[in-house]
C-alpha cells in the first residue's frame, strides 16, 4: 500500500506543478493552434469577452477567417506571455487586442494602470516586430464586477485606461476601435440589453462590436 501511495504521489506532484506553471494557460489553445493550416486574417486576443464571442456568433469568425484566442479571467500580463504561441505563430495579418477588464477587476491584485498599459503596448510591439498589424480596442463599459464586488470606481478606471490606449494608438498610427462610446449607458456601464451580468456582452452587444470592428479591418 505504501508503495502504491508513493507511486501515486510521484505522478500527481509533477501534474500539479505543471498546472501551477501554466499560469498563462498555454495549453488552452495548443491543440487548436496546431490545427491551423491557413494564416487567419485576424486573431482576436483577449479575455472572457473575446472568449465568448465565437460561441455567440460563430459565423462572424468562420466567414471572415478570424480566430478567437480569448481566455476567461485573464489579465494583460497573461496575454502577453502567450502572445507568441497564440498570435505570432499563427501569422495573421491583424491582431485585435481587447484587454484590461480583468486588470481593473483586480483578478491578479490591485491594478497598476501603467503596467497594464505597458503590457498592451508590448503586445503591439511584438505584433509589429513580426509583421502583424495591431488593432487596439477600448475596454467595454462596466460599473462593477460580480466576482469581485469590492472593486470600486470601475467605470472611471476604464475611462482612464481607454484614454491611454487611444492616445497611444493615435500617436503610433494604430487603428482604435471604440466599443466603449457605442455601448455605454448613462451610468458609464452596459445596459442590460447588451450585458445581462453587466460585463459579458449579449448577442446584441456583440453585434455592435462586430459592426465597429469590421469597419476597422
Language-model regions, residue ranges each:
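Positively charged n-region of N-terminal signal peptides that target proteins for export
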Residues: 1-4
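Hydrophobic alpha-helical transmembrane segments of integral membrane proteins
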Residues: 10-11
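Serine-esterase "nucleophile elbow" of acetyl-processing enzymes
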Residues: 18-94
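Alpha-helical cap/lid subdomain in secreted, periplasmic
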Residues: 59-65, 81-217
Amino acid at each position: 500500500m505504501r508503495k502504491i501511495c508513493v507511486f501515486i504521489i510521484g505522478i500527481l506532484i509533477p501534474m500539479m506543478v505543471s498546472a501551477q506553471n501554466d499560469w498563462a494557460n498555454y495549453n488552452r489553445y495548443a491543440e487548436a493552434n496546431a490545427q491551423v493550416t491557413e494564416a487567419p486574417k485576424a486573431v482576436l486576443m483577449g479575455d472572457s469577452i473575446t472568449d465568448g464571442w465565437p460561441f455567440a456568433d460563430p459565423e462572424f469568425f468562420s466567414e471572415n477567417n478570424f480566430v478567437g484566442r480569448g481566455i476567461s479571467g485573464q489579465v494583460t500580463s497573461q496575454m502577453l506571455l502567450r502572445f507568441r504561441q497564440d498570435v505570432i505563430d499563427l501569422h495573421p495579418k491583424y491582431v485585435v487586442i481587447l484587454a484590461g477588464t480583468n486588470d481593473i477587476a483586480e483578478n491578479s491584485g490591485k491594478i497598476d494602470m501603467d503596467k497594464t498599459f505597458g503590457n498592451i503596448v508590448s503586445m503591439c510591439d511584438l505584433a509589429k516586430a513580426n509583421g502583424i498589424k495591431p488593432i487596439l480596442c477600448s475596454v467595454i463599459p462596466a460599473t462593477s464586477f460580480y466576482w469581485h464586488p469590492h472593486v470600486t470606481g470601475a467605470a472611471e478606471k476604464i475611462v482612464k485606461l481607454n484614454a491611454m490606449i487611444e492616445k497611444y494608438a493615435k500617436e503610433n498610427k494604430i487603428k482604435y476601435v471604440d466599443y466603449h462610446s457605442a455601448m455605454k449607458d448613462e451610468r458609464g456601464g452596459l445596459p442590460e440589453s447588451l450585458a445581462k451580468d453587466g460585463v459579458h456582452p449579449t448577442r446584441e452587444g456583440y453585434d455592435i462590436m462586430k459592426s465597429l470592428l469590421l469597419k476597422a479591418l
